[in-house]
Curated annotation (Swiss-Prot):
<dbReference type="GO" id="GO:0005813">
    <property type="term" value="C:centrosome"/>
</dbReference>
<feature type="binding site">
    <location>
        <position position="23"/>
    </location>
    <ligand>
        <name>Ca(2+) 1</name>
    </ligand>
</feature>
<feature type="binding site">
    <location>
        <position position="68"/>
    </location>
    <ligand>
        <name>Ca(2+) 2</name>
    </ligand>
</feature>
<feature type="binding site">
    <location>
        <position position="130"/>
    </location>
    <ligand>
        <name>Ca(2+) 4</name>
    </ligand>
</feature>
<dbReference type="InterPro" id="IPR002048">
    <property type="entry name" value="EF_hand_dom"/>
</dbReference>
<feature type="binding site">
    <location>
        <position position="32"/>
    </location>
    <ligand>
        <name>Ca(2+) 1</name>
    </ligand>
</feature>
<comment type="function">
    <text>May function as a specific light chain of unconventional myosin-10 (MYO10), also enhances MYO10 translation, possibly by acting as a chaperone for the emerging MYO10 heavy chain protein. May compete with calmodulin by binding, with different affinities, to cellular substrates.</text>
</comment>
<feature type="binding site">
    <location>
        <position position="105"/>
    </location>
    <ligand>
        <name>Ca(2+) 3</name>
    </ligand>
</feature>
<feature type="binding site">
    <location>
        <position position="94"/>
    </location>
    <ligand>
        <name>Ca(2+) 3</name>
    </ligand>
</feature>
<feature type="domain" description="EF-hand 4">
    <location>
        <begin position="117"/>
        <end position="149"/>
    </location>
</feature>
<feature type="domain" description="EF-hand 1">
    <location>
        <begin position="8"/>
        <end position="43"/>
    </location>
</feature>
<comment type="subunit">
    <text>Interacts with MYO10, the interaction is calcium-dependent and essential for MYO10 function in filopodial extension.</text>
</comment>
<dbReference type="InterPro" id="IPR050230">
    <property type="entry name" value="CALM/Myosin/TropC-like"/>
</dbReference>
<feature type="binding site">
    <location>
        <position position="132"/>
    </location>
    <ligand>
        <name>Ca(2+) 4</name>
    </ligand>
</feature>
<dbReference type="GO" id="GO:0150034">
    <property type="term" value="C:distal axon"/>
</dbReference>
<feature type="binding site">
    <location>
        <position position="141"/>
    </location>
    <ligand>
        <name>Ca(2+) 4</name>
    </ligand>
</feature>
<protein>
    <recommendedName>
        <fullName>Calmodulin-like protein 3</fullName>
    </recommendedName>
</protein>
Length: 149
C-alpha cells in the first residue's frame, strides 16, 4: 500500500514523523504522540493515546515506527478527509476564530509543532494557498490546498 506513494509524499511523511519522534530514535511512543497532540490544542487521555498507537502498531512493540506510520498515512489518504476533520484542522490554525489563517497564526502553530520557519518560509506557505491574494488563507483556500496536495 505504501508503495503507491510518490517520493515527495514519502519525504513529507518522513518530515511529519520526525515532528512526532521527539528523541529521534525512529519510534513514536504514546508520550511523544501526546506531546504533539497537546501542542495542537487536543487533550487526549492516556487510554486514547494507547488506542491510537495500538491501531497503527502492527508488530505489537508498543511504539510506531516509520513503515507503520507510512502505512497509516497512505490508508488515511485513501479515505479522503471528512468535512469535519478538515474544519477541525482549520480551527487549529485559525487561533482567533475570524475565519482566516494569518501568517502569524501559521507561524504559531508550526512553532508549537517544533518547526522553526523563517518569515520568508511562512510567507511562501501563505502565498501558495492564498488564491485571492488578500494575504491570509480562508477556509475554501485551506480545503483547496489540502485536496490539491
Amino acid at each position: 500500500m505504501a508503495n503507491q506513494l510518490t517520493e515527495e509524499q514519502i519525504a513529507e511523511f518522513k518530515e511529519a514523523f520526525s515532528l512526532f519522534d521527539k528523541d529521534g530514535d525512529g519510534c513514536i511512543t504514546t508520550q511523544e504522540l501526546g506531546t504533539v497532540m497537546r501542542s495542537l490544542g487536543q487533550n487526549p487521555t492516556e487510554a486514547e493515546l494507547q488506542d491510537m498507537v495500538n491501531e497503527i502498531d502492527k508488530d505489537g512493540n508498543g511504539t510506531v515506527d516509520f513503515p507503520e506510520f507510512l502505512t497509516m498515512m497512505s490508508r488515511k489518504m485513501k479515505d479522503t478527509d471528512s468535512e469535519e476533520e478538515i474544519r477541525e484542522a482549520f480551527r487549529v490554525f485559525d487561533k482567533d476564530g475570524n475565519g482566516f489563517v494569518s501568517a502569524a497564526e501559521l507561524r504559531h502553530v508550526m512553532t508549537r509543532l517544533g518547526e522553526k520557519l523563517s518569515d520568508e518560509e511562512v510567507d511562501e506557505m501563505i502565498q501558495a494557498a492564498d488564491t485571492d491574494g488578500d494575504g491570509q488563507v480562508n477556509y475554501e483556500e485551506f480545503v483547496h490546498m489540502l485536496v490539491s496536495k
